[in-house]
């Protein structure tokens, strides 16, 4: 397609200097959105994390016409979107169909390392889901789409209330990746579950995961399940979650139960 849209944002696929990007603009010129995009782009230029992609704010870059024929220049964002990467769910579907446990285990390590960095850096992505987690050929993990991102800001009165916004999502996704690393056939069942489809929702499978983790002696999974079971859309206890994810990144415990029969 020539373009796609989500909410009030429209995106065009472009190639610039041999690299693939998404060029994004807002359907509504709102000063608050423009300022937010500018701040995010400036902040990401400073931190340069391997878990993020290039994100550039370009002022007055695109000439647009309204339905009356009047023209004007608007600001846009240029976000790197390498065509050799795959969204998390597509990557997992292929790896699970091939039964490639080693690649899934490597992905789990990379994903947990990304999640630990995100939590400890006090950065809030704001929209973590499978389609916004891109996987490279070497299993490295890259977050994309930063329109809802919040930077660490001590002067923002609402920052404390949103700083834990990503925790439920990264915990659910880590749990799902760990499950299919043990049983790749389980992905066909878990893909439609909240764990992958809408990871902000508490999955009804958590009690089953607790039993599996307890039986296998997998302490990181059990700890994450306990934290998710006590959460209500927001999982507090950032340091505890970061530590559990750090341990999970190197955990090789087989969950030992065929999840496809549950």
Model-identified regions with their sequence ranges:
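Helical subdomain adjoining the active site within ATP-dependent kinase catalytic cores
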Residues: 172, 178-261
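Activation of the activation-loop gatekeeper triad in protein kinase-fold domains
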Residues: 145-150
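ATP-binding glycine-rich loop module of kinase domains
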Residues: 7-58, 262
């Amino acid at each position: 397609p020539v373009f796609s849209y989500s909410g009030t944002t429209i995106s065009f696929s472009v190639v610039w200097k041999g690299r693939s990007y998404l060029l994004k603009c807002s359907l509504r010129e709102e000063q608050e959105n423009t300022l937010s995009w500018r701040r995010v782009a400036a902040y990401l230029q400073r931190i340069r994390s391997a878990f993020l992609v290039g994100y550039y704010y370009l002022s007055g870059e695109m000439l647009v016409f309204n339905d009356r024929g009047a023209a004007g220049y608007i600001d846009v964002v240029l976000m790197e979107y390498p065509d050799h990467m795959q969204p998390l769910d597509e990557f997992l579907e292929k790896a699970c169909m091939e039964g490639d446990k080693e690649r899934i285990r490597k992905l789990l390590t990379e994903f947990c390392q990304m999640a630990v960095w995100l939590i400890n850096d006090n950065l809030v992505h704001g929209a973590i889901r499978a389609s916004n987690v891109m996987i490279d050929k070497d299993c490295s993990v890259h977050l994309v789409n930063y329109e809802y991102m919040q930077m660490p800001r001590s002067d923002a009165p609402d920052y404390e209330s949103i700083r834990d916004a990503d925790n439920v999502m990264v915990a659910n996704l880590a749990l799902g990746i760990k499950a299919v690393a043990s049983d790749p056939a389980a992905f066909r069942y878990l893909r439609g579950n909240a764990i992958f489809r809408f990871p902000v929702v508490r999955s009804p499978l958590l009690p089953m995961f607790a039993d599996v983790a307890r039986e296998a002696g997998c302490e990181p999974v059990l700890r994450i399940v306990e934290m998710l079971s006590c959460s209500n859309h927001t999982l507090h206890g950032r340091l505890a979650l970061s530590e559990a994810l750090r341990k999970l990144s190197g955990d090789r415990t087989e969950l030992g139960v065929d999840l496809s029969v549950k």
